Amino acid sequence: MSLFKKVACFTDIHFGLKSGSRTHNQDCEDFVTWFCETAKRENCETAIFLGDWHHNRSTTDVSTMNYTVSNLERLSQSFEKVYFILGNHDLFYKDKREINSIEFMRLFPNVIPIKETLTEGDVTIMPWLVADEWKNIPNIKSRYMFGHLELPSFYMNAMVQMPDHGQLQAPHFANQEYVFTGHFHKRQHNRNIHYIGNAFPHNYADAGDDDRGMMILEWGGKPEFKTWPDQPIYRTYKLSQIIDKPDALLKDKMHCRVTIDLPISFEEANFIKETFVPQYNLRELMLIPEKVEVDAQSTPIDINFESVDTIVMNQINAIDSDAFDKALLLDIYNNL
């Protein structure tokens, strides 16, 4: 008997993100509600969460704990079985799995924590791999594999690819028809490996990339991806753009960074912000001055202007040291 007939999956929801923000935690709860309702309509009897339920590996505030328990209960009541992968953010230590932040799962008998690799029938489900566990992957023959994997050449976000550290590689999954994984938030695939995309956009590293949500897989079929229609979104615009076409560009629950490319006063800029935020129910509208500094005495030259985000990410990616975890540094920066 197969582990599932029709499975619904999501990943990397990160309860407790943004210092335990109530707004973010409520977004997470609203997403889980939508996920369960959608899975029920699609007749999914099984759910798999692919890792990173919590954001902070060392501390979880009381409000976040309450959201965690209520949403684990919601998942438990919505499915016959829920397989729950421990991601790196769910572990107190990144290099071992002995302590995790989701021990609440023991309250729900049909929520099954994946603390060690589980193979049942033609399905393998793996937690965040530690030490040399990756070396066992080529020996696994399962048709379907679910995990929380860190694979080189895939994008950690829209700009930065995961560097190759000479360990787990895409060719190690030659025996699988499909590999589904969390960890990198951008939805992407290469051959048989699918990063399904996290639950919804979390920060400006996700700006303009709304392909997030859930995945549904019927045994023997092809994966189907669905985007949460009420998700918060992130955008970067120029002021001239939003003044010209506000109705087309500004949306409900939007976080918006706007570069001031017009000659306006502080009072005018503040008026625009105070008008647009309530009118379009924006979560955030940040007005950023456009700074261009050119030496008047110099001859004309081509200047390549880079955003602060680009500069910081390039500098982190250029670090050549085994003492630093580039992926972790990028994750910390993106969530500032």
Predicted regions and their residues:
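Core catalytic region of metal-dependent phosphoesterases/phosphodiesterases
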Residues: 4-6, 17-117, 172-176
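Conserved beta-strand elements of the Class I
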Residues: 8, 122-124, 215, 233
